[in-house]
């Protein structure tokens, strides 16, 4: 399969989506941040000096989705209909799992926006509690589901 972001001279290009049909596009991505017990407890007990960590991560994730085309060179700038972020507390592993669901009516999908949303949300958590635990790990950032468009639906294997 030829790469769509290269022209005949093997130079980068942005794909022309002008002839594509506008359809509903949805993408769900997820990722996890793991930390020590002290950092986890500080977040859930709202004792972080920088402020409300999880609420700030949600706002940052929304901003990340909106700014995707400014940071990923070949991403199209598209209007987003909605970004919904959910953060699950995983007490036994001192982790948080962040989910981002992005929706649009467009000629191209929102997978990158969902992945960017997760990444920025998790990085925000790291930034806000790095004074407590610099050894935090971000892992498993992945596309869980996408629907709409020519390639159809995708569901990650569980």
From Swiss-Prot:
GO BP, sorted A to Z: Mo-molybdopterin cofactor biosynthetic process
Pathway assigned to this chain's UniProt record: Cofactor biosynthesis; molybdopterin biosynthesis
EC number: 4.6.1.17
Gene name for this UniProt entry: moaC
Any Pfam family matching the protein: MoaC
Active site: 127
Disulfide bridges in this chain: none
Protein name as annotated: Cyclic pyranopterin monophosphate synthase
Keyword terms, alphabetized: Lyase, Molybdenum cofactor biosynthesis
Gene3D superfamilies, per the entry: Molybdopterin cofactor biosynthesis C (MoaC) domain
Quaternary structure and partners: Homohexamer; trimer of dimers.
PANTHER family in the record: MOLYBDENUM COFACTOR BIOSYNTHESIS PROTEIN 1 (PTHR22960:SF0), MOLYBDOPTERIN COFACTOR SYNTHESIS PROTEIN A (PTHR22960)
Lineage top rank: taxon: Bacteria
Residue positions binding substrate: 74-76, 112-113
Matches recorded under HAMAP family: MoaC_B
Family membership: Belongs to the MoaC family.
Catalytic activity: (8S)-3',8-cyclo-7,8-dihydroguanosine 5'-triphosphate = cyclic pyranopterin phosphate + diphosphate
GO molecular function (one): cyclic pyranopterin monophosphate synthase activity
Function of the protein: Catalyzes the conversion of (8S)-3',8-cyclo-7,8-dihydroguanosine 5'-triphosphate to cyclic pyranopterin monophosphate (cPMP).
